[in-house]
Amino acid sequence: MAMETERKISIAKAIIEKAIEVSDKTKHDVFVDWAPHVQWVEVAIYLGGWKTGKNEYEKFTISFNRNTENVFKACMARLNELLTEAGNDFCD
C-alpha cells in the first residue's frame, strides 16, 4: 500500500528540520536529498563537516515503499544523538 502524501511530507519536513539544526549547532554537515523516481529521502551525515573529496559519511535511505518507520526512527535518533553530543561539548 502506498504511503499517503501527507505522511511523506511530514517525514521529509522532520528530517530537513533536524538536518538544519544539526548542521547549524554542531561541527557536522547533514545533506538531504529527495528522489521522487524511487520514492526515498537520502540523508548523508559528514562527521566533522563536509570537505572536497571526503567520502566517509553515514547514510540513511528512508524509502517510502518499505521499512520507512524503522529507518526514519534510526535516522532521527542518530541526528538527535549528534545534537546531544554537541551540547555536552559545551559543558567540558
Give the positions of each predicted feature.
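Negatively charged, low-complexity tracts enriched in Asp/Glu with abundant Ser/Thr
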Residues: 1-42, 49-92
